[in-house]
Amino acid sequence: MADKHWAQTDERGSYWGILFVLRAYQYGGHWLMRLVLAPVITYFFLTGKASRRASQQFLRRVHEFAGGESPFTQPPGWRKSWYHFWQFGLHALEKIDAWVGKSPKYTVRNCGDTQFSELEKRPEGGLLVGSHLGNLEVARAMAGKKYSRRLNVLVFTQHAQSFNKALKAVNPKADIDLIQVTDIDMGLAIMLKERIDNGEYVVIVGDRTSVTAPQQSVSHEFLGESAPFALGPWILASVLECPVYFLFCLKNPEDGNYDLYLNFACEQLKLPRKNRQEALQPVLKKYAGQLEQLAIHYPYQWFNFFDFWHKDSQ
């Protein structure tokens, strides 16, 4: 018998690994997992030199850019960076809460110019552009429980199919569809267009450049310096010819509840092949501007632990 393809073997192993973590959390509880988290986070903080440097770079940039509005009283050091890592771990636990369907102990309040209830009234769906700032899973879980519109989440990591299968095993009522993609092609666009025409919504992040084509990016100022942003989500928005919204969900450090920012971006994004990047600037300016503002107010919820400005590669 011929050996299995490596992707098949890896996919099978990843399913059981994901299922084990979800089951352990489901029965072990939040606080037990939190006890395990502290040494794990400390280990990754001590051994992850590049991630630690990226954290310190970001926190210091926020402090310098914000000036008198800085969330820090002095330049952030290694203690602030460790706390940054710690918050990443805590948010990961709350993501699992959302995935397995546990009743949250927090509330989600709307702070944007649009509410999910307004989206329910529209005949068609739309594109929700988020980021790795905050916790989109909480927003997805809230929307899934309170509203009928289906959320299709595009992810650029491996094993989305395994995750979908494991999630259904733990929480059969889960109605979040993770769609694993390596590239945005016409076949994907056609499938998503059909779903949007049926009233569903597509969630995609816009702050990281393409895994397969990092050169397909567009630059915009962010925290005082030019940074590369993904081009794919905006091209997809143009192809889908649908309403576009920005979606951010961040934990308020004062009361532990979540602030949901759902903001209308445009009714339809038109990007001609000629001068595409110039035509994109108005909506990208709005997106980067809101991302920047929220990053200053919620700096510990910035979960891009890499050189976001690509300074090390210059």
Q: What is the meaning of each model-derived region?
A:
Residues 32, 135, 302-303:
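Short hydrophobic/aromatic residue motifs in ordered secondary structure
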Residues 8, 42-43, 103, 127, ...:
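Short, contiguous strand/loop micro-motifs
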Residues 16, 51, 108, 184, ...:
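Soluble or luminal CAZymes and related metallo-dependent hydrolases
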Residues 108-109, 133, 160, 182-186, ...:
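A conditional alpha-helix N-cap/helix-loop micro-motif detector
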Residues 73, 80-83, 87-92, 122-183, ...:
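Catalytic core of membrane glycerolipid acyltransferases/transacylases, capturing the structured
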Residues 69, 120-121, 145-146, 169, ...:
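Non-catalytic C-terminal accessory region of glycerolipid acyltransferases
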Residues 109, 179, 263:
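General small-molecule cofactor/ligand-binding pocket signal
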Residues 1-130, 168, 173:
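Membrane-anchoring hydrophobic helices of lipid-metabolizing enzymes
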